[in-house]
Structures are given as C-alpha cells and as structure tokens.
Amino acid sequence: MNKRGKLTINLIRNEESTMNKNGKKLGIFSFLLFLLTALFTLASGNASAEETTPAVSVTGKFADTITIVNVSNNEGGDLNWDLEQWATFRINATYDLAGKNVKAGDQTTVTVPEALIITSSSFEIRDINTNEIIAHATVDAENKKLTLTYTDYVEKHSDTNGSFFFYARIDFKKHPQQGEIPVVVTVNGVTKVAGKVTFKGIGDGNPRTLTKTSWVNNTDYKTVSYTISVNRNRQNIKEVTLEDHLKFTSASYVKDSIKVIKGKFAYVDGEWQFSDRVDVTDQHKITIAEDGQSFVIDLGDITEADQYRISYDVRLNYQPVDGELLKNDATLKGKGVVIKEITNASAVQIAGGAGIGYVFTINVHKVDDANQPIKGAKFKVVREANKQVIGEYETDENGNITVNALLKDKYILTETEAPAGYVIKDADTVVNVEDFGTD
C-alpha cells in the first residue's frame, strides 16, 4: 500500500528564527522549508574604513557625508581569494547627512586608486520606501571617479542616511604584476582605507582551444553579448563543429547577430588582441534549433593557422536583477579529439543603493506520517522568471535538501520521483518572493 502524508511549509528568517508562517496542507509528505535571508550590511566587507583625517563639515558645494567604506565580493560577502584579470568586486559605502546642512546640488566625490577601474555605469540612490531620488551617482571611469549629486530630497527630509555600492576591477595595464593592492579611496580629498585586494597578475593569457566571454549591456541589462574564441593555442583539428546552448529559456538569440570572424590572436600587455579580421560568416553553415535555444556552426577542418572569433547577442524577455548569473554552454567537437566544453556565466552587475545577491537558501526536510525522515525523494528547482533549472536534488538520510545561492525570486519545487512505497500527489510547491521576507 502506498503511503500518504502531509506537506507543511514553515517560512523562517534566520535573523528571527522564532517567526513562522502557518503551515498549509498540500498533500503527501511533510516538508519544512526554511527560507534563509542573509541581507549583507555594508559592515560585512574585508575591512572597515579608517579615516586618515577627522570628519570635515560641508564647505561650499562639497558634502562630506561618507562615514564607512569597505570592499567585498560581488555578492556582498568577504573577498578572501585572489582576483583574476577581469574579476570584479564591490566597493561599499555608507553615508549620513545628519548635521551636514546638505542642499540640492551639493556633491560628494569618491575617487578610486590608480590601480583600479570603476566598471559600473551611473546610477541613482533612492529612498527604499518612496522610491524618490536622493542623489544621482555619476561615474567618470576615465578619471576613476564617482560623484554623488544630491537632489532637493535632502532639503525636505532630516537626518538622511543610507548606503550604496559600485563595482570595480584591477587596472591591469597600470598594475600588471601579482600582489596585494591597498584600496584607498579619496572622498572630497580625504583618504579613507577601504581594505585590500590581491591580484593574480596578468600571466600568459592561458591560451586554449575554446574560450568564452560575455558581458551584460549596461543600458537596460536585457542584452547579453558573447564572444567565443577558437584555437588560441594553434591546434590542427578535423571536422570541427561549435555548439552553443542557452541554459535559461526566457531569452532568445538576436536575429542575424551571429558572426564568424577569422583572424589572428596575440596576447599583448595583458589582453588578447584579434587582428587581420575577415568576416567569413557566409562561408560556414549555421543551424539554429527549432526552439531557438541552441545553434551549431560548422567550421570544417582547422589548422594551427586558423583562428576564429564567434560573436552573438542574446535578448532577455524579463528584467534581470543585480547578482544574477546567466549561464550557457559552448562545446567544440572534432574528429579524434576530446570534446572541449565550457560553461559561461554572465553576471548582471547593477550598482545602486541596495543590491540583491546570491544570498538566499531553501532547506527542505521530508518526513513521513510518523515524523521520520525519508531518504531518496527527488526534486527539481526552477526559477520562474527565466525557467532556468537551478538543480536537481535528492533527500539524504536525514530527509534534507539544501539549495544555496538563490536570488530573492519566485521558485517552483517539483518532486520528480518518490521513494519506494510512496506516491506523488501534488508535485509542485511554489515559493514566492514575499515568502523570503523583507529583511
């Protein structure tokens, strides 16, 4: 006889573990879903700021409002690893306008050291409750400077305070060597120590048969551009095909954006350069799958003298959020060679006064009617926004599954296979955005 049970969902924040939501009966087993929010505060970086001079009051149009500056990884946590050449990190800051007599048009400037580059675009700092603009943050990448220009919001509200962050990376042309880099920012001419980062150095570029890079358009964040570099290490391969497959479904390839360019690769001053370019797109067969989620390019036989760069764009049909990773695969196949497969994750990085990162967790606990753990139940977790499969999981001997690195978004938990002696009645369990809480 197949067993039946109950599905109980309790939503608990890790800051206040005594809070819960009334369980709802959905059918067959008992689950305990813990939605753990870990909203990073700006004090959780590698090092808090240390002022080299005392705080200064407002003088003219410059408002000295920054109280703390620190560095963190892209998700807001500790940056405890060495940075690669193009790797980014966050610079976080808190500000407090209390007692500063700040007026509309007053400014605060933040300048990063010569060894860094600001990679964020300009953004706005807003009131988290009313969405009113508190300040415009303008990025001057060439001069390594970010300027806050305050609006009349600051004259209509008292004791305004908050936080913001932006992304940066190592300027490897000015600092190519391996080693530790102090992150000392200048705020209105006053230096503040934000912490330090360690750079791996530019190295030899790691020439490979297949390399894939991507970046997100920083205008609307809905267009992702990809480049695939083929044969940087100068191999001879017969009957070469290149396959690309999107791992998120709420998106499609931009029509006519796929280009095949032939040229020559060279690693110069820390960057791969591609010269002597010739567009050979019309010389190669390109097949796009009926579902629009993959394509295949027939490159034919390649010699050590044949090097290619394939480029294309993908358009999302939803609005991504800061911290989101957009993954897709590329595979190179050839006669008598090992398949070269790479997975590329393009990170959405939107600077602002608040951020959402991969800091949420779903814990599933499965028990029978006697409240004993059940091993071997299989589940699939899908993010609703882009239909991306987060992963497939199986309960352990304690009846537990842990799904880490989630955005604060809607997810569908689908039971795909029940253990022996049990049946699936209601396969899907929905986790909504509001279930995670607002902390």
Task: Enumerate the predicted regions with their spans.
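Solvent-exposed loop/turn and edge beta-strand elements of beta-rich ligand-binding domains
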Residues: 4, 9-439
